[in-house]
A protein has these predicted regions:
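Class I SAM-dependent methyltransferase SAM/SAH-binding core
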Residues: 1-60
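Glycine-rich phosphate-binding loop signature in dinucleotide/nucleotide-binding domains
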Residues: 61-65
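Core SAM-dependent methyltransferase catalytic element
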Residues: 153-154, 177-179, 221-231
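A short SAM/SAH-binding and catalytic strip from SAM-dependent methyltransferases
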Residues: 67-82
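Conserved catalytic/acceptor-binding region of the Class I
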Residues: 83, 96-170, 186
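C-terminal helical/coil "lid" or tail adjacent to the Rossmann-like core of SAM-dependent
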Residues: 157-215
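Helix-to-beta-strand junctions that scaffold the AdoMet/dcAdoMet cofactor pocket
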Residues: 79-80, 93-95
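Short, conserved SAM-binding segment of the class I
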Residues: 84-89
């Protein structure tokens, strides 16, 4: 199962080649638009796409105790109740089934979003708006927190690695365009202020990240990689 499959690229390009003996991939995402896109552009005879929410047991219970392998890439940082998500994964897996997770714990994008929200120019626009900054960033959770949680749920932790990754972008333009596209606040900015918002976010990100030795803008994220087994 691919949890948080998005537009389906990982399922087709990564999971199908990685598991040559698989019988079926159930690829699920919370957003119907993502599933529509995946079915149109990344269809495959071995992949079944469905709208489902890993935090809502009722939407996934038809697969409980049937999944041998589960992958969730860059998905769990969006969850409001990560423990519930992990518990639902536990219920999905067969005995001996394994799950792999990769998600952001803390990042300079989160830090920049929090600073933008405090800026008097923008703060009134974002009152009551969900910024989707991960709880792990707010509460400074690290690998030991998740390792304990997963063991308490009943998983055997096979692999747990926390690592800060720094990525450089090819140009200021790419950097300036990319982050507003994944920032939850952008859609709440009036059209006539979009460019000003993009510039302010760009400057705040530069303040958080700086530039690499070649002068290119960069971004840091503290990533967690986990592999667990249901005993």
């Amino acid at each position: 199962m691919d949890v948080g499959c998005g537009p389906g690229g990982n399922a087709v390009q990564l999971l199908v080649p990685l598991f040559p003996k698989l019988e079926k991939i159930f690829a699920v995402d919370l957003l119907p638009d993502m599933i529509d896109f995946a079915e149109k552009h990344n269809s495959h005879s071995l992949i079944e796409y469905s709208v489902a929410n890993i935090e809502d047991r009722s939407s996934i219970e038809r697969w409980e105790n049937k999944i041998s392998k589960l992958v969730a890439l860059h998905c769990f940082q969006w969850l409001k109740d990560q423990r519930k998500g992990f518990c639902n994964v536990f219920n999905l897996l067969k005995s001996g089934g394994e799950a792999a997770f990769c998600f952001v714990l803390q990042s300079s994008l989160y830090a920049a979003i929090l600073e933008i929200q405090k800026n008097h120019k923008w703060s009134s626009l974002f009152e009551g708006v969900d910024d989707y900054v991960a709880n792990s960033h707010h509460d400074n959770y690290h690998s030991s927190y998740y390792e304990k949680m997963l063991k308490d749920i009943g998983f055997e932790v096979l692999y747990c690695k926390e690592e800060v990754k720094i990525d450089s972008f090819t140009s200021d333009e790419e950097y300036r365009d990319f982050f507003p596209s994944i920032c939850a606040l952008t859609s709440h900015v009036p059209a006539e202020q979009k460019e000003e918002f993009k510039e302010d976010l760009f400057q705040e990100l530069l303040k958080q990240n700086g530039r690499d030795s070649e002068g290119l803008p960069q971004h840091w994220g503290n990533m967690l990689e986990l592999v667990v087994r249901k005993e």
